[in-house]
Amino acid sequence: MRMQLTAVLAASLLAGCQNQAFREIGQAPSMSPIGSGLQYTQAPQLAAYPKQPHQMTAGYSLWNDQQAALFKDARAINVGDILTVDIQIDDKASFNNETDRSRTNSSGFNLGASGESQTSDFEWSGNLKYGSNIKTEGDGKTERSEKLRLLVAAVVTGVLENGNLLISGSQEVRVNHELRILNVAGIVRPRDVDADNIISYDRIAEARISYGGRGRLMEVQQPPWGQQVVDLVSPI
């Protein structure tokens, strides 16, 4: 048992020493290499999307149906093209759930017997009673308010067979040893990209938007890794 505990502690210490925060002591958080965010981490199920119908030959025409705009600038439709994602999130939600359950149960059983013989008299009686009372009360309330306004450039990383685009983009800003990271990925239709080559976040299917940070402030807000391990394995 002692050896197992020692092994667990050693593994925890090793994991803690490998933390990136240890390598950044005394210096600002390092930024990711350019191009590291151009990956759609969750591959879509291509079989769920219909294939692009066969198009008629355009002959010698310069018109491109995918652009669908004669007097507007070209929009992103090919792998490597860049478009802008407009993120405007202003959500508020409030949930209030209340549960009250009560049950009472009572059972009784009586038994009696008496008799007489030439040698002795006997009398016997019994009484059994059982009762239970169960009551459960629960009250839960959740309030959430989010407001986010950002613009981020994304790159077309793939084109599905039906013409929809896979996009992925990231943005990192480092201020006073604090690194703010914005990631966005999803599937868009070329027709939803406006004339300014901008698409709203609510028109992105399978959208994956994350906004967070890494640095000294985040380390203070998070509990120590040792406490997280104890909270994970503690049965109480």
Swiss-Prot record:
One of its GO terms (cellular component) is bacterial-type flagellum basal body, distal rod, L ring. Residues 1-16 form the signal peptide. GO terms for molecular function: cytoskeletal motor activity. The keyword Lipoprotein applies. It is a lipid-anchor. A lipid is attached at residue 17 (S-diacylglycerol cysteine). The basal body constitutes a major portion of the flagellar organelle and consists of four rings (L,P,S, and M) mounted on a central rod. This is Flagellar L-ring protein. The lineage of its organism: Bacteria, Pseudomonadati, Pseudomonadota, Alphaproteobacteria, Hyphomicrobiales. The gene is flgH.
